[in-house]
Amino acid sequence: MTQVAKKILVTCALPYANGSIHLGHMLEHIQADVWVRYQRMRGHEVNFICADDAHGTPIMLKAQQLGITPEQMIGEMSQEHQTDFAGFNISYDNYHSTHSEENRQLSELIYSRLKENGFIKNRTISQLYDPEKGMFLPDRFVKGTCPKCKSPDQYGDNCEVCGATYSPTELIEPKSVVSGATPVMRDSEHFFFDLPSFSEMLQAWTRSGALQEQVANKMQEWFESGLQQWDISRDAPYFGFEIPNAPGKYFYVWLDAPIGYMGSFKNLCDKRSDSVSFDEYWKKDSTAELYHFIGKDIVYFHSLFWPAMLEGSNFRKPTNLFVHGYVTVNGAKMSKSRGTFIKASTWLNHFDADSLRYYYTAKLSSRIDDIDLNLEDFVQRVNADIVNKVVNLASRNAGFINKRFDGVLASELADPQLYKTFTDAAEVIGEAWESREFGKAVREIMALADLANRYVDEQAPWVVAKQEGRDADLQAICSMGINLFRVLMTYLKPVLPKLTERAEAFLNTELTWDGIQQPLLGHKVNPFKALYNRIDMKQVEALVEASKEEVKAAAAPVTGPLADDPIQETITFDDFAKVDLRVALIENAEFVEGSDKLLRLTLDLGGEKRNVFSGIRSAYPDPQALIGRHTIMVANLAPRKMRFGISEGMVMAAGPGGKDIFLLSPDAGAKPGHQVK
């Protein structure tokens, strides 16, 4: 079906320029790249851009620690980031930096328009100040307890647990991250963006149906709690752009960071001597499409502040936000001590890029779900799918074609109806790529691969090859297998760019989406060379060990639970006495339908029953084994309403998480209801 060519601008969230790219970052960049490559295959004009987020106090302080200028540090980090993305074959048209002249000009332009339109407000605020370091403390350099959900150890601008945003002065028991000192209050004039003025527009945008349901629901919560004016200025010393006509005041990093999307595209247009496209893509009434691939941790900034800034400065809003979840490794948060905090460059020293691209793609959907990189499953899936199903289809047929027919395929299809089944799948698979239902696309493709291999098994060319007078049958069977391989590789081209290059070299033709409608008949292929090698767990072991060694080299040689989870600040005996710990008997334990993390526990406190949800399913895959066991619970924790019911307390467990978590039990003789003292 012929499609009308679209103009599309695609971005990934800008990596912060004070650290290396790791496998968590790569999920987003791979997801976006697969989608972009598919769009290009369908004939659309796609500009795929990114940049380093290069401003802020963390950059300034790290450069000071290294004894170099911030400019030198971000320059070196940009080269490292670009090398990593190139290693994973992320097909950016441009990779720039927010510390650029284009970004400065655009930041000042947007700010001036917002100010002219009455959306910038000035007022004096009381701000946290580090008396030991002699500096105002930016949001991320204050930590304390979230004022909304009371989660400890949260940054000064937003809570990573509940997603709330707030002022650093709202933190409970704040501490300076720089010195550990308790901050004091000092007055300073700041500039605020009047976000509440855009509430009606943002709510209409939310209800348009374009956003993911989970994003729209979260935004509705923020609307109900009320939008607040947003502080867009920071005091010197600060590494960033100084605000025009405001000496000593700088744009907050989150103001100029998303403008970096525009800056990178402007830089690309200038490189092309293109004076038209920037306005064509960013003007208010643009018909081009604009998509931001982002993680769920920065939805607030992209769904509220960014579209409001664009609206208030007379630029177009994003067409959509494509939001993804986090990456876990082996069922747990990435851990430096366990060697599962893996840098992109370390991965490429042990595996190829296509393997991770395939595994992530096979697990991704359009939902905001976390993705688990199970390294054992990774090895099994890559070998089973890429090697055994796809590549093997070519190798088991190519030998006969090369040796017996000088590489020339048959002039007719052996099974036209089977070939039509494969090409008819283009609509379903294409729609899955388009809608970011990547896992569905992979399942459809692998089902076809099974069908193709079943055909070859049934036709048994190795038997036909030994039978006199059946050369034509042999050529037809093997040509059919190679044509089916071509269709499969065409569908997988957005995912496996390097394997695609090798497949195209063998097939002696470029793989195009529409090209599969015409099979390769009477076509000469090149001599077959191994397309892909099997992988094994020894490579995984080497990868994990290398990651551990990198951590040792980069930090103090202290490893273990205390290194991963340092002891919290001292509390008083009175604080501890508020927590009522009791012995509880586990009367029943069962899975929670709809959750892959929770168990539902029925606890007997010696006269009172409690229903508790606990995230220990990975560690206890057989919940029945817990029945009859004694454990320790927090008995006076306020009940918490969850999607699955109300949790009436918390059981105590130790360990880093995932499968490595251990339920606490008292010594023999302890009875349900006994208080822990």
UniProtKB/Swiss-Prot annotation:
Zn(2+) binds at residues 146, 149, 159, 162. CDD domains: Anticodon_Ia_Met (cd07957), MetRS_core (cd00814), tRNA_bind_EcMetRS_like (cd02800). Homodimer. It is an enzyme of class 6 (ligase). GO terms for biological process: methionyl-tRNA aminoacylation. It is found in: Cytoplasm. This is Methionine--tRNA ligase. Keywords: Aminoacyl-tRNA synthetase, ATP-binding, Cytoplasm, Ligase, Metal-binding, Nucleotide-binding, Protein biosynthesis, RNA-binding, tRNA-binding, Zinc. HAMAP family: Met_tRNA_synth_type1. Is required not only for elongation of protein synthesis but also for the initiation of all mRNA translation through initiator tRNA(fMet) aminoacylation. Its cofactor is Zn(2+). Coiled coil: none annotated. A motif ('HIGH' region) lies at residues 15-25. A motif ('KMSKS' region) lies at residues 333-337. It catalyses: tRNA(Met) + L-methionine + ATP = L-methionyl-tRNA(Met) + AMP + diphosphate. Binds 1 zinc ion per subunit. PROSITE patterns: AA_TRNA_LIGASE_I, TRBD. One of its GO terms (molecular function) is methionine-tRNA ligase activity. Its EC number is 6.1.1.10. One of its GO terms (cellular component) is cytosol. Belongs to the class-I aminoacyl-tRNA synthetase family. MetG type 1 subfamily. Residues 575-677 form the tRNA-binding domain.
